[in-house]
Amino acid sequence: MAKQIKFSDDARKSMVEGINKLSDTVKVTLGPKGRNVVLDKEYGAPLITNDGVSIAREIELEDEYENMGAQLVKEVATKTNDVAGDGTTTATLLAQAIIREGLKNLAAGANPIVLQKGIKKAVEKSVEAIKARSHSVTTKEEIANVGSVSAADETIGKLIAEAMEKVGNNGVITVEESKSMGTTLNVVEGMEFDRGYVSPYMVSDSDKMVAAMEDPFILVTDRKITNIQDILPLLEQVVQQGKPLFIIAEDVEGEALATLVLNKIRGTFNCVAVKAPGFGDRRKEMLEDICILTGAQLITEDLGIELKDASFDMLGRARKVNVSKDKTTIVDGNGDQSKIEERINQIQNRIPETDSEYDREKLQERLAKLSGGVAVIEVGAATETELKERKLRIEDALAATRAAVEEGIVAGGGTILLDIIEEVEKLVDDVEGDEKTGVKIILKALEEPVKQIAINAGIDGSVIVENVKNKDKGIGFDAYKGEYVDMLKAGIVDPTKVTLSALQNAASVASLLLTTEAAVVTIKKDEPAMPQPGPGAYM
């Protein structure tokens, strides 16, 4: 395929066009008075949202160079969303500001590599300063504040805080669509793990692609099931009981899988199988957790039990099991409560003894799954369009709240970025030339979030920025009420993790674009139109 190449300013200008188109679309959603964006969908109703990453993902531009720029900024939003779950609009806005200021200086003859060095130093200093001003989240009220600011809805913040109070900060919280108009919180004892059905033919709801089982028997083994004869005696006994069977195994394949699927399709019996969660030794421990929770016996050759020798009383029970393509939730297992508590104590005792951060994290995960249960936020609305928009906001708010619990909070509304300007300015005297210019680019970009929040509220952004800079640290502009307040006391806060991710990802992609000297795209060939059939062609 032939390629087209553009160089230096020509290449950068074309890409910046795309960056501006994407960023200008996303930044109108920032702040308490931010607007929504309507996204056309190929099927169904349009989606109305103020979620930065959802908007960015939808944007594809016709011009290849513009699209290349848009995709780079889309990467900023996506990466920030993956790491922190929120802050995507701020990240996009910061990237646009750094690129805009950087290009002005490149046009004036600045060296892009030295400029990049200055940007990097300023970001490192900013990260240090933000971390120093971070406050840990301890109370239910603080957790509610984070959720309220993220979702721009106080009731959502309170709902998330309540969910975290009931299942613990590391507990499993899911967001689902409700059949009613209201948004409610339900807490059920249960366990969730990241494994889905081994065959899509096992689903019970083909629209949502989920398999739901009421009151199933549960078979747990660390072996691979390939021969149906190994589990036939158990299957027959389960069928006689008229209940579904849920299988957790290393894998289910070959003849065994074909037989289970065929019988499911014919309606002979309902069976869903998933692969065992985890790997290596951790897998065995997780299977033991599931057994204790459901009252099952782990069928493993390590204990001298083979699949064909397994008896009916080795099966566990649960009130409900839901399986999607990548997730399984076991609700209300039939395990002995004293054994569950004993297992919880074992895991709690192991956490302080573990040196590895990763192992500690996994132990805490297991602990949450055994002790916390599952909190389900059921989202209701008058129309499907409103429901989707509300669900997205709650998912963002939940991610922001988790990030706040993990790494703390800072003054919200972009205030923290203005508060650290004084400290970052100290770098200006330590560097010179284009490196100094790089530092100044970040100083200018740090003003953007406050400015844009004010603009979206219909106020002159530059005036607000200067006013906040002249006030005490922590005093920011509440765009909703139109007054200056102590942001932490007013409950207008942002998770530290979200702010850091937004700044770091924006600077990373922006500085790479500034060092770009050529852009290469594929030349699209115009496909010839299909020839029209002549007379009598269909006779």
Curated annotation (Swiss-Prot):
It is an enzyme of class 5 (isomerase). Gene3D superfamilies: GroEL (3.50.7.10), GroEL-like equatorial domain (1.10.560.10), TCP-1-like chaperonin intermediate domain (3.30.260.10). GO terms for biological process: protein refolding. Together with its co-chaperonin GroES, plays an essential role in assisting protein folding. The GroEL-GroES system forms a nano-cage that allows encapsulation of the non-native substrate proteins and provides a physical environment optimized to promote and accelerate protein folding. Keywords: ATP-binding, Chaperone, Cytoplasm, Isomerase, Nucleotide-binding, Stress response. InterPro entries: Chaperonin_Cpn60_CS, Cpn60/GroEL, Cpn60/GroEL/TCP-1, GroEL-like_apical_dom_sf, GROEL-like_equatorial_sf, TCP-1-like_intermed_sf. Forms a cylinder of 14 subunits composed of two heptameric rings stacked back-to-back. Interacts with the co-chaperonin GroES. Pfam families: Cpn60_TCP1. Coiled coil: none annotated. This is Chaperonin GroEL. GO terms for molecular function: ATP binding; ATP-dependent protein folding chaperone; isomerase activity; unfolded protein binding. It catalyses: ATP + H2O + a folded polypeptide = ADP + phosphate + an unfolded polypeptide. Its EC number is 5.6.1.7. Belongs to the chaperonin (HSP60) family. The lineage of its organism: Bacteria, Bacillati, Bacillota, Tissierellia, Tissierellales. PANTHER family: 60 KDA HEAT SHOCK PROTEIN, MITOCHONDRIAL. Its main location: cytoplasm. ATP binds at T29, L30, G31, P32, D86, G87, T88, T89, T90, G413, D494. It is found in: Cytoplasm. GO terms for cellular component: cytoplasm. It comes from the Bacteria. It comes from Finegoldia magna (strain ATCC 29328 / DSM 20472 / WAL 2508).
